[in-house]
Amino acid sequence: MSQKNETAVLALSLLITLGLAGTGIWWLTSRGGINLGGSSSQNSTVSKSPTGNSPQSDQAIQQRLSAGQKLLISDKATTTKQSAIQAYASGNYNAAISDLQASLKTNPNDPEALIYLNNARIGDRKSYTIAAAVPIGADINAAQEILRGVAQAQNEINQSGGINGTPLKVLIANDDNNPEIASQIASALANNSEILGVIGHFGSDTTLAASKIYQQNQLVAISPTSTSVQLSGIGSNIFRTVPSDRFAANALSRYMLTKLPKQKAAIFFNSASSYSKSLKDEFTTAVYGDGGQIVSEFDFAKGNFNAAESVKSAIAQGAEAIVLAADTATLDKALQVVQVNAQRLPLLAGDSVYTAKTLQVGGAGSTGMVLAVPWHILADPQSNFPQTSKQLWNAEVSWRTALAYDATKALIVGLERNPTRTGIQQALLASDFSATGASGPIRFLPSGDRNRAVQLVIVKPGNRSSYGYDFVPLPGL
């Protein structure tokens, strides 16, 4: 491809990406199909969380927390949902229940509404409370995917009579996937004695920052999405239901070397992301250990990063495959690489690239790309979760929903054994601990990691996504 054509493709990619950025992801809101895919005396409000990296006031942090008295996800909020928030805030739980039920009939794919409905049904009765920390302000689609898993587990346990007769309440926290904000939210949660456990956080950097607070306060946190190897053994109260990057890197390395088969790779990564660096480093180790080679590295974080020039350089240096270790913040740059590459080199990627936007923007250029993800809805036909989740949400769900469901189920089992902070931690580390999740049995290693293989998926033409391309499971290596 000539330099002129590469530049044209890149320009078109940028225009497409910008055009799609404001539209949201169709899967998450409109119709059944693949779904890839935050009582008080305070007045109800549509929470507009402050942004930025400077420390926020206690009041600003409280605006990021809600069990039903604040609207954290205003996107496509129905009028009945907004009135339910007002009713919940004033303690009129019956009105809140009625309005939330009406809202869910209009938008059954709304996890915030389902969580608030279950909380309203509890009202002021005794309950066990956990928090779900999600990146509403930074990645609303990922936030809702995670909340769907939490909401489904809460809904199931409460419909079955609760935890030894006591219902489960969920507090939603919006951390914007910002490490500093996450630390402040972690402090607020740790200082609230009613919070017995936390689901979160989203990105590895955010979880790493918050984990220090949780560990100091002996509050269990289970991340469904943070994969950096830095989290392994970081603290006896820190767990995750998602496999670490080591599992993903090993699977991608084996696929490249034995199935493509190719020996030389170029890696694109974000040096400002713990997750991205972790996946890059683990893949590099795996490839060299298996007899392959990394011929070049390209950093998305560099101010002069150019997708067309980088792909051209990778090919000139002998790369036979491209590995996209992008994080959420650099997904657009990764998709520029996909466009410019134009299927010249095979593509491999981590789980952050598993989004509807990849199919939407990557289009034909993403065909044949292989990704390592923790779970896929079509890969485990024996599980009940794919069917029950589709019935509840009127759409198929992503791995983020499944692993958030698993994290919530693990906390529920911990609460069943001993409904205290220390009791939950001891239960999760017990040799006989086991919970049944969407992705199979849930057990934790002493490091807090989950010992579970990843699933490889490939992009193929299809109609499940409405974009003309789908993620399809690959058989195990």
Which role does the model predict for each range below?
Residues 2-477:
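Extracytosolic ligand-binding ectodomains
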